[in-house]
Amino acid sequence: MESIRELFRICNGPSSSHTVGPKKAAEQFLARHRDAESFRVTLYGSLAATGKGHLTDAAILSVLEPVAPTEMIWKPETVLPFHPNGMLYEALKGGKVEEAWTIFSVGGGALANEHTKQRKPVDIYPLTTIEEILKWCQAEGKTFWEYVEDYEGHDIWEFLSTIWTTMCETIERGLNNEGVLPGGLKVRRKASTYMVKAKSFNDSLSSRSKLYAYALATSEENAAGGIVVTAPTCGSSGVVPAVLYNIAQSREIPTVRILRALATAGLFGNIAKTNASISGAEVGCQGEVGVACAMAAAAACQLFGGTPTQIEYAAEMALEHFLGLTCDPVCGLVQIPCIERNAVAAARALDANLYACLLYTSDAA
């Protein structure tokens, strides 16, 4: 299993599979064909069906168009066998195709084809299921974040510090930005309004309202094409930051503990990515917001003193109640129902944490 560095990525929204992946593919293709006279890019399946709303064409054209004229072709009715997010890049010179390259955006900004990943990450974790890692924790007397540290090395904390700083900056920007989101649905930003109202409520209601505001802040920034952290994807990027920011602010948790919780969240997200999928186009929103909720629940449970068994149970519960959730955004925009779904998932993550902590009293349970 690869590093959590491959899961947490700092990028522009609104979609890791529909913008980050295609842009990365365009950059790789351009590096091989800087002398091309023109380019032709064909989008298939989900990329073509929702690409306009996800700004897929804008991401690709921002790379290729400055070098040579680029034609975009949309084929939503054609789904290539390997994955719904298929792309065909063609470089033309003298009226002839120099290279035709079929590639797929498989979620979280990652690329793959039928044969191999474009840049095969180094597998650093020997265990690839939570069941195995839980047994390791019990045998070693350690918990999940220590498993991450053992195999990632101490420099993982510097990386996670950058990730956490970016998450906080995104929330703070989102809380201050107002107005209508781009795309034509005329969806107004709500994070700042929720935050103002939260300050007038009693402690319990205020805390939950702030949680919603934090999740909305990141999700609205994502919808506007702002900088977010994939956790595990752009479309689900509001859940983990909201939960951690809420706990950090309300309980004055030191940063070092937040980073450890983030490591645990990354581990659980990585497990889902390795054994299943975090691509909404491939497995629906259960693989995006569902996995994000599990990541956040695991992180929260750790911060509240949960044992490895309780942490695992919180993550399991958080994910299983999102099973079957589809990815069917209105007009292909990462706005309805995506934004409010992040807020609901953040609340559900804290509910799963509480439920798990009440159910189990020891790791022997």
Predicted feature residues:
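Alpha-helical support elements that line or immediately flank enzyme active sites
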Residues: T19-R32, P241-E252, A298-G305
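C-terminal regulatory domains involved in ligand/effector binding and gene-expression control
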Residues: T70-S200, K210
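A glycine-rich helix N-cap at a beta->alpha junction
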Residues: L61-M72
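Accessory "access/gating" subregions that flank catalytic or transport cores
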Residues: E169-E252, R257-N270, T274-G280
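N-terminal signal-anchor module of multipass membrane proteins
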Residues: E2-N12
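Conserved small/polar residues in nucleotide/adenosyl-binding loops
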Residues: Y360-A365
